[in-house]
Structure formats: structure tokens, C-alpha cells
């Protein structure tokens, strides 16, 4: 018998996460590694759990993630977005809880590009009066 799986794609900065939710005991696997090994910061692990906590489904689903691009923060945000979208496929009645927590919105903030004549995106070269 084929097992039921729910899919969601999340994006944040330059990271893209493909998330699968499978009914289980709450294991989280990121790129075939345990999530505690993959993401060393407890605060970012809390970010990943937010959609499951908001819908009170923590421990009901195994979360299998394939994520690429970006750094720890971008990847954690992408996984959070993907988990929230996958939970909508599980049960559409989770939408109000996820929406009020702001978990369905794609965070569109990106790194601002460096401009010519400047040292960074906005930082100007040092100014000398004389």
C-alpha cells in the first residue's frame, strides 16, 4: 500500500526547499541528515518547527526535506515556508492558523545589489574634505 505524502515548496532569500510530510512520529530529516546535525543553531530549529506548533501537529508527521542554496537562515526560512504549504495540503482548515502566524507569506526580502562607485550596496567610499 502506498503511503500518503504531502508536498510543499518553500523559498527564502536564495534557498529553495522541497518538503514532504509523511504520517509518522515527528522525525525531521534535511538532505538525508538528521536536522540537529544539519542546522547547528537551536533558534533556527525553532523557526522550522513554527508551522507544526501553530497547527498543533508537532510529532504527527515526519518531515523530509531537500534544500539547496543560501545559508543557514535562508534554508531554515525556506523549510518553514515549505512545511506550512505542505500542511495546507494535509488539511485546508489549517489556513487561518498559518496565515495569522504569517507562515504562508513568501518573505520577499533579498540582498541589495552592490552599485558602481560604492563600496557595497549603500556604503560610500570615505570622504575627505582636504
From Swiss-Prot:
Basic residues: compositionally biased ranges: 111-130
Entry GO terms, CC: cytosolic small ribosomal subunit
GO molecular function: RNA binding; structural constituent of ribosome
InterPro entries (alphabetical): Ribosomal_Su5_D2-typ_SF (IPR020568), Ribosomal_uS9 (IPR000754), Ribosomal_uS9_bac/plastid (IPR023035), Ribosomal_uS9_CS (IPR020574), Ribsml_uS5_D2-typ_fold_subgr (IPR014721)
UniProt xrefs under Pfam families: Ribosomal_S9 (PF00380)
SUPFAM superfamilies reported for this sequence: Ribosomal protein S5 domain 2-like
Keywords: Ribonucleoprotein, Ribosomal protein
Keyword Ribosomal protein: yes
Keyword Ribonucleoprotein set for record: yes
Name recorded for this polypeptide: Small ribosomal subunit protein uS9
Source species: Listeria welshimeri serovar 6b (strain ATCC 35897 / DSM 20650 / CCUG 15529 / CIP 8149 / NCTC 11857 / SLCC 5334 / V8)
Higher taxonomy: Bacteria, Bacillati, Bacillota, Bacilli, Bacillales
Gene giving rise to this polypeptide: rpsI
